Amino acid sequence: MIEGPYFVLTVLGALACGVSAGVFIAFSAFVMKGLAALPPAQGIAAMQAINVAAVSPAFMVVFMGAAVLCLVLAVVTFVLWPEQGTVELLLGSALQLVGAFGVTVAANIPRNDALAKLDPEAPESAGPWRTYVSEWLMWNHIRGGASLAASASFILALT
């Protein structure tokens, strides 16, 4: 049975991954759809503002906290190799670290950086905006699914 500080780390990992999943899924379910329905200039400007606002302590604590917790959980799991939950803890950690954090760094952030360079009012920005929405959403679906699966995996480790 997982107990003590290891239990607390696992619960915190499940919560952090679950909150991350909620943020990602909200963007996939309605935020990006709403922005895509706007005229391109408005959608681009709104997403540029969202990307600036996202670099906030509240979001960073959740996003980076989930990654740090998963890294710590993976290391502790390798060291302790508990009788229960080992596979679930390692799987959950890998899902969050690769499927959410890794995808963010490798796919979503570069697209956000490219979007930041667009002039919302320029007519030629409409094409890159449509491409951005499509590609960013695909990667965001992966982040949301990975975070949700990571949270579920940690919960399973506790049962």
Q: Where are the predicted features?
A:
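Core segments of transmembrane alpha-helices
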Residues: 63-73, 143-151
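Interfacial segments of alpha-helical transmembrane regions
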Residues: 3-18, 79-98
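Interfacial loop at the N-terminal end of multi-pass membrane proteins
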Residues: 7-8, 19-64, 110-134
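Hydrophobic residues within membrane-embedded alpha-helical segments of Major Facilitator Superfamily
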Residues: 9, 16-19, 24, 69, ...
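Juxtamembrane boundary at the C-terminal end of a transmembrane helix
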Residues: 155-159
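Mid-bilayer segments of alpha-helical transmembrane spans in multi-pass integral membrane proteins
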Residues: 97-106
